[in-house]
């Protein structure tokens, strides 16, 4: 996909702050520091558009990025980060649940997992949450450049089995370093646009 125009529209905490209009939205969910911002940057060919951080738990808002005035990537705060308080975790849970369960513009979730390791309990819970609410899900197994190509399928199989991936949902092996899986990801998103 040719990207002509990207704009960070709003960092939202409450429903009233979500952008108006009917453009399709794709929400990126995943553990803190799994590479959601790097995924966005690679997909839109920008170096540091979605700010990446080496501090886990940095994104505490829903960040809406408008792409080509055609759709949004919504960067969801990462989960599974121990250093936030119980109150913050509950507020996070409420914010995420509200977005995923009420937002009509949400077309699909992109669950970002680390291909190097089996999905965590939090990843499994997130996937089950998405399936409970019948949200179409594309699993992006990132950091593929960090393991030998010959082991990709083996790692992908573990990820699919751990998540108990249903046949409607696809897993794409991805690398923000090399661009591996980028065209495949655009192809998969296209069907919801």
Swiss-Prot record:
GTP binds at residues 30-37, 57-61, 75-78, 142-145, 174-176. It comes from the Bacteria. One of its GO terms (molecular function) is metal ion binding. Pfam families: MMR_HSR1. Its cofactor is Mg(2+). The keyword Ligase does not apply. Residues 22-193 form the EngB-type G domain. One of its GO terms (cellular component) is cytosol. The keyword Zinc does not apply. GO terms for biological process: division septum assembly. Necessary for normal cell division and for the maintenance of normal septation. This is Probable GTP-binding protein EngB. It comes from Anoxybacillus flavithermus (strain DSM 21510 / WK1).
């Amino acid at each position: 996909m040719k990207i002509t125009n990207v704009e960070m529209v709003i960092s939202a905490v409450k429903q009233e702050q979500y952008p108006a209009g009917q453009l399709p939205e794709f929400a990126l969910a995943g553990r803190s520091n799994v590479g959601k911002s790097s995924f966005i940057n690679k997909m839109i060919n920008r170096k540091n558009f979605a700010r990446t951080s080496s501090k886990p738990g940095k994104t505490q808002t829903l960040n809406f990025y408008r792409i080509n005035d055609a759709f949004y990537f919504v960067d969801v705060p990462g989960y599974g980060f121990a250093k936030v308080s119980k109150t913050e975790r509950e507020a996070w849970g409420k914010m995420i649940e509200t977005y995923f369960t009420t937002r009509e513009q949400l077309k699909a979730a992109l669950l970002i997992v680390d291909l190097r390791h089996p999905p965590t309990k939090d990843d499994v819970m997130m996937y089950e949450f998405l399936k409970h609410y019948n949200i179409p899900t594309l699993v992006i197994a990132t950091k593929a450049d960090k393991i030998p190509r010959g082991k990709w399928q083996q790692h992908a199989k573990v990820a699919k089995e751990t998540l108990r991936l249903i046949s409607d949902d696809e897993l794409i092996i991805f690398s923000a370093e090399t661009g591996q899986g980028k065209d495949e990801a655009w192809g998969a998103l296209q069907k919801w646009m």
